[in-house]
Amino acid sequence: MASQGTKRSYEQMETGGERQNATEIRASVGRMVGGIGRFYIQMCTELKLSDYEGRLIQNSITIERMVLSAFDERRNKYLEEHPSAGKDPKKTGGPIYRRRDGKWMRELILYDKEEIRRIWRQANNGEDATAGLTHLMIWHSNLNDATYQRTRALVRTGMDPRMCSLMQGSTLPRRSGAAGAAVKGVGTMVMELIRMVKRGINDRNFWRGENGRRTRIAYERMCNILKGKFQTAAQRAMMDQVRESRNPGNAEIEDLIFLARSALILRGSVAHKSCLPACVYGLAVASGYDFEREGYSLVGIDPFRLLQNSQVLSLIRPNENPAHKSQLVWMACHSAAFEDLRVSSFIRGTRVIPRGQLSTRGVQIASNENMETMDSSTLELRSRYWAIRTRSGGNTNQQRASAGQISVQPTFSVQRNLPFERATIMAAFTGNTEGRTSDMRTEIIRMMESARPEDVSFQGRGVFELSDEKATNPIVPSFDMSNEGSYFFGDNAEEYDN
């Protein structure tokens, strides 16, 4: 988030723009996704993919990963300086799936990074179009958020695996810029900071010298990003303490973990954007849609409308349920991994179930999986209604701080209560309220204790019919207040491994 006073919308962050009016924002976001679409079409031509093969989400992901790898300056430099066996630093590639005699075949392709960069720039009016690259990173991050659990990563940094709802964007690369910072959850920022502090504890030179100065600047910048996500004065004051610490150590780690726990009830503001796979934008461009002229928004009706009439396919393993695979991708498309299932189900128009009950693994297929038994099916990515994506944590009473369940970070701006187990959360706060941050800790705990699970968030906000593009008639759903829905309860998903 930029400093107060120059708050830019996500779209501006996403397109690297300075302050623009709504029409200019819509046009520049449109230009960004249009560029992605043009690039995708060109890549399909290069690879001689049929329209059918081009609609396969696995092919889309391979192509997206190739362009991200082609523009990864730091990794490219590293690869050139540390040549490893069997890795050509100048090439990038991945699995492409083709339809042959009624079966899907895997083919590993290899391309010059330079060539990929040329195609990308050509599709983006000769520019590097970093915003489009970030957009693809956020789509991959949203897919990871819906697919994997981060229990191991949480435990490694001393956090509680039940804090998974704070982990949005935990797999985003460092280079994802302001748009990336906006979508990172409180837990993700805390984890990045704890890793940094731990390195400082173990490595005496981490904060020293010319490099240490740069490290320090990065540390303070990350602290400010996290501070900007908190909505209460006490949480922000604690972040100032962490940032200004002369020599960050265990006290800072304690404070950060305390703050992460507090965010389960006093929620942070985390942005949500619907970032779709490149093939979806490609389909639209190919059908003659002019994104720049029509304008586009990541937080309004546009992504819903795009998904209403695009057919995306996915490979399906023998014992996977295609409907479950569709739910996974739908959640990823709308950045709804941490949303209340009651809200997601209402918007989608079909029941969205917790991940522990899904019979599906990740979207990507490992190179050792047998293609003989692979089938494909059309993903059902349509919705019954649409709703505006939110950037607030849904805190009530003057939108300051309020209730939250262990495990929800609202995506849609739709009225609901945010049920939570206060006993479970408060149990984590026994004991330590001494030290420099004692008064802030006491204040935070007091606010958490006064939060009521029955309070309504997003008062008066509703969903809209897909024909209601100007959002004139909100339909405010009524939810069963007792039956909260978290995607992560009873979870048995795979861990995310880089």
UniProtKB/Swiss-Prot annotation:
Q: Where on this chain is Bipartite nuclear localization signal (motif)?
A: 198-216
One Gene Ontology MF term: structural molecule activity
Query: Is the keyword Iron-sulfur in the record?
Result: no
Domain of life, source organism: Viruses
Q: Name one GO biological process term.
A: symbiont entry into host cell
Q: Which one Pfam family would you cite for this protein?
A: Flu_NP
Q: Can you summarize the PTM annotation of this record?
A: Late in virus-infected cells, may be cleaved from a 56-kDa protein to a 53-kDa protein by a cellular caspase. This cleavage might be a marker for the onset of apoptosis in infected cells or have a specific function in virus host interaction.
* Compartments reported by the entry: Virion; Host nucleus
The short motif Unconventional nuclear localization signal is annotated over 1-18
Per UniProt, which keywords does this protein have?
Answer: Capsid protein, Helical capsid protein, Host nucleus, Host-virus interaction, Ribonucleoprotein, RNA-binding, Viral nucleoprotein, Viral penetration into host nucleus, Virion, Virus entry into host cell
Question: One GO term of the cellular component aspect?
Answer: ribonucleoprotein complex
Q: Where is this region: Disordered?
A: 1-21
List the SUPFAM superfamilies.
flu NP-like
- Subunit relationships: Homomultimerizes to form the nucleocapsid. May bind host exportin-1/XPO1. Binds to viral genomic RNA. Protein-RNA contacts are mediated by a combination of electrostatic interactions between positively charged residues and the phosphate backbone and planar interactions between aromatic side chains and bases.
Role summary: Encapsidates the negative strand viral RNA, protecting it from nucleases. The encapsidated genomic RNA is termed the ribonucleoprotein (RNP) and serves as template for transcription and replication. The RNP needs to be localized in the host nucleus to start an infectious cycle, but is too large to diffuse through the nuclear pore complex. NP comprises at least 2 nuclear localization signals that are responsible for the active RNP import into the nucleus through cellular importin alpha/beta pathway.
Per the record, the similarity remark reads: Belongs to the influenza viruses nucleoprotein family.
Q: Could you tell me what this protein is called?
A: Nucleoprotein
The species is: Influenza A virus (strain A/Swine/Hong Kong/126/1982 H3N2)
Give the gene that encodes this protein: NP
